[in-house]
Amino acid sequence: MINEIRKDTEVRMEKCLEVFQNHISKIRTGRASPSILDGIQVEYYGTATPLRQLANIVVEDSRTLALTVFDRSLSAAVEKAIMTSDLGLNPSSAGTVIRVPLPALTEERRKDLIKVVRAEAEQGRVSIRNVRRDANEKVKALLKDKEISEDEDRRSQDDIQKLTDAFIKKVDAALAAKETELMDF
């Protein structure tokens, strides 16, 4: 029973870490990355469709993304979707290819993005701690029902705390890497 709780806790903490890493990967750093455009939806036959499903996105150089739209009739809709997104990008169409130049980040914008990343990291830590709390409550319930001894309870809580510390270290490492990436010129 305790092993099941531990495995479930580890899986849930891993998901919290994945969500955090996914969120910070979408924060623009000044370097071109196709993941920047992940959140963009394009109106396609009356349905909002992810841009990735409608175009091939490649990094042309460190500051430019190139999109090759599969259906040429969608080029205008793709450009409009990129322009109206909150990313502050201005695509330009050159025949079959849409180029998206990424403007350099100002110092002020970099600091704002670091604040956002730190807030995301704190949210990730809170999520991991909530998973720890849930796991500890399950262990306490087992102790209360006399299914485990107090020694097993203490050992389980120590294991859960070690897991929590390990995942919070991973969040902190990802945060430090993203901050470094944002401050690189």
Swiss-Prot record:
GO cellular component, as recorded = cytosol
Q: Does the keyword Glycoprotein apply?
A: no
Q: Which GO terms describe its biological process?
A: cytoplasmic translational termination
Origin superkingdom? Bacteria
Subcellular location(s): the record lists: Cytoplasm
Question: Pfam families from the xrefs?
Answer: RRF
Q: Name one GO molecular function term.
A: ribosomal large subunit binding
Q: Which UniProt keywords apply?
A: Cytoplasm, Protein biosynthesis
Parts forming coiled coils: none
Q: Does the keyword Cytoplasm apply?
A: yes
- Write out the similarity annotation: Belongs to the RRF family.
What's this chain's function?
Answer: Responsible for the release of ribosomes from messenger RNA at the termination of protein biosynthesis. May increase the efficiency of translation by recycling ribosomes from one round of translation to another.
| PANTHER family linked to this entry | MITOCHONDRIAL RIBOSOME RECYCLING FACTOR PSEUDO 1, RIBOSOME RECYCLING FACTOR
UniProt cross-references to NCBIfam families, sorted A to Z: frr
Supply the name of the protein.
Ribosome-recycling factor
In its UniProt entry, the species of origin is given as Yersinia enterocolitica serotype O:8 / biotype 1B (strain NCTC 13174 / 8081)
